[in-house]
């Protein structure tokens, strides 16, 4: 018997893209999970699309509404809701992302293998850009990771795990570790660095999985440019740009 695993997807104004995310989750090779979609106040039909999918999904689906604005609040509400209902493993992606078919299986394998948190590989969505755009996105990930390693706030001697940049849209964590570090900051994005460093102070059990692949929307790259997007992924904010470029 498998341990309960829930996939949590925060969503805001994603009526144009959430169908792709849900289709990708339905195509997982490991479908022994419950899907929880946490809507953050959408007015564009996102919730209706989620409910339509739930009616025929190949796994249990629940849809919540989180009125407190911010992806951190939506994720925290979703994770705690899942934990209260027996989840021991939690995976997260976003409503504009496309998890590859082995994503859930890789997340489960990483957590079962002893990791407290597993972070995966990010790629650009193939339906949003060509080869040049995907190469630019790969360069962005490398740049953001290199910049992050140099930041003083990521180099504290109290950290028990080495720095590696990750985006919240491709991660998995045990329920015990999530609760032990106090959960996701309940605030608007960016939140990933705060959460990541809470984990790094608490445990060395952070793993990277090349098999845990998510295709990421490049809307932010198109809106901010490479350096601006790198700053965003480093949790330095949007520097006056629209923090939610939909």
Regions found by a protein language model. Give the residues of each.
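Short beta-strand-to-loop acidic/aromatic patch adjacent to the donor-nucleotide binding site
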Residues: 86-98
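Short, flexible, basic/aromatic active-site loop/helix in glycosyltransferases
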Residues: 120-127, 136-163
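Conserved donor NDP-sugar-binding/catalytic core segment of glycosyltransferases
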Residues: 102-134
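Short, acidic, metal-binding catalytic loop of nucleotide-sugar glycosyltransferases
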Residues: 23-32
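N-proximal low-complexity "stem/linker" segments adjacent to membrane-targeting elements
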Residues: 1-24
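A conserved acidic beta->alpha catalytic loop
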Residues: 39-48, 97
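Glycine-rich, basic loop-to-helix element that forms the pyrophosphate-binding segment
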Residues: 66-85
């Amino acid at each position: 018997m498998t341990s309960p695993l829930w996939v949590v997807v925060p969503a805001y104004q994603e009526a144009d893209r959430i169908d792709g995310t849900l289709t990708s989750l339905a195509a997982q090779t490991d479908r022994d999970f419950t899907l929880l979609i946490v809507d953050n106040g959408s007015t564009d039909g996102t919730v209706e699309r989620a409910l339509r999918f739930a009616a025929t999904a190949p796994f249990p689906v629940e849809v919540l509404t989180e009125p407190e604005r911010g992806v951190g609040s939506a994720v925290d509400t979703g994770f705690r809701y899942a934990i209260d209902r027996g989840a021991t493993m939690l995976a997260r992606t976003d409503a504009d992302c496309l998890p590859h078919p082995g994503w859930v299986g890789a997340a489960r394998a990483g957590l079962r293998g002893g990791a407290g948190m597993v972070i995966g590989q990010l790629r650009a969505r193939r339906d949003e850009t060509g080869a040049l755009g995907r190469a630019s996105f790969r360069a962005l990930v490398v740049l953001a990771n290199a910049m992050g390693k140099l930041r003083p706030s990521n180099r504290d001697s109290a950290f028990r795990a080495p720095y590696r940049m990750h985006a919240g849209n491709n991660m998995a964590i045990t329920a015990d570790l999530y609760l032990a570090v106090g959960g996701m900051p309940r605030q608007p994005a960016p939140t990933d660095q705060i959460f990541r460093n809470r984990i790094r102070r608490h445990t060395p059990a952070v793993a990277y999985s090349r098999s845990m692949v998510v295709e990421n929307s490049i809307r932010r790259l198109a809106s901010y440019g490479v350096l601006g997007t790198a700053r965003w992924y480093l949790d330095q904010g949007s520097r006056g740009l629209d923090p939610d470029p939909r």
